[in-house]
């Protein structure tokens, strides 16, 4: 039987710190949050493998390394208010919540949203609010946000997300014109109308579905075989 606490520590040492993640807050969060609580029971022994894992609704829990990369790139700080698009199991929200003051997270699948609420409550994580809806609209009632990150890839950065960033806010999102192949981009809001954008690396995420993302009817019902492989949330370059 896998020793899960020991496996978690090895994951942080080898997959996270060992691959150039240096933010001490991110490393502490990855050590603190039990990933096994966010995966299906029959996959718990694989919780700390360097791979995404399938959950429900043809979605996945992201590869630990890419979660750490995205959150490090978002430069989260204590006191930050964060918006996540694509709750999934709730794992990335839990990691962000271990650093930031509060996390709003939006999930379009009601069953996934409810499961994430229950998991977060069971773990005593009380600074995450899970919302159900079209994440491409963001969450206007909670804006502005110090950081926004998306766990799904779209054809472009939704306008609402840019508008809901605070001045100095950071946005991390997979963007690409192919549904399962994207580049991870970082957007920083400099002034009311000026944004900096740069590419951090190549990634593969499930599609962002919504009014300002991919139309649901155009997305394949069954993701490609790679979707549940270690490259589903690709191993981004170490210079991210």
Language model regions located:
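Class I SAM-dependent transferase core
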Residues: 1-87, 91-95, 99, 112-129, ...
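Intrinsically disordered, low-complexity regions enriched for glutamine and histidine
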Residues: 61, 82, 107, 230-231
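Conserved nucleotide-cofactor-binding alpha/beta core module
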Residues: 75-195
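Long, low-complexity, intrinsically disordered segments
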Residues: 230-240
């Amino acid at each position: 039987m896998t020793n899960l606490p020991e496996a978690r520590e090895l994951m942080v040492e080898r997959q996270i710190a060992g691959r150039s993640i240096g933010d001490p807050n991110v490393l502490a969060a990855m050590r603190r949050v039990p990933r096994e609580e966010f995966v299906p029971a029959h996959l718990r022994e694989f919780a700390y493998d360097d791979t995404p894992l399938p959950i429900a609704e043809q979605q996945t829990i992201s590869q630990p390394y890419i979660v750490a990369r995205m959150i490090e790139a978002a430069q989260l700080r204590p006191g930050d208010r964060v918006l996540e698009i694509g709750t999934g199991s709730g794992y990335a929200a839990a990691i962000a919540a271990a650093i930031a003051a509060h996390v709003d997270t939006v999930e379009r699948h009601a069953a996934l949203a409810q499961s994430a609420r229950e998991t977060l409550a069971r773990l005593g994580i009380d600074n995450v609010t899970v919302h159900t809806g079209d994440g491409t609209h963001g969450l206007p009632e909670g804006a502005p946000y110090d950081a926004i990150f998306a766990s799904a890839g779209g054809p472009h950065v939704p306008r609402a997300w840019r508008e809901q960033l605070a001045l100095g806010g950071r946005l991390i999102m997979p963007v690409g014109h192919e549904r399962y192949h994207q580049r991870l981009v970082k957007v920083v809001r400099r002034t009311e109308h000026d944004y900096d954008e740069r590419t951090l690396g190549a990634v593969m995420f499930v599609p962002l579905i919504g009014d300002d993302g991919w139309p649901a009817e155009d997305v394949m019902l069954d993701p490609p075989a790679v979707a549940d492989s270690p490259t589903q949330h690709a191993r981004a370059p170490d210079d991210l």
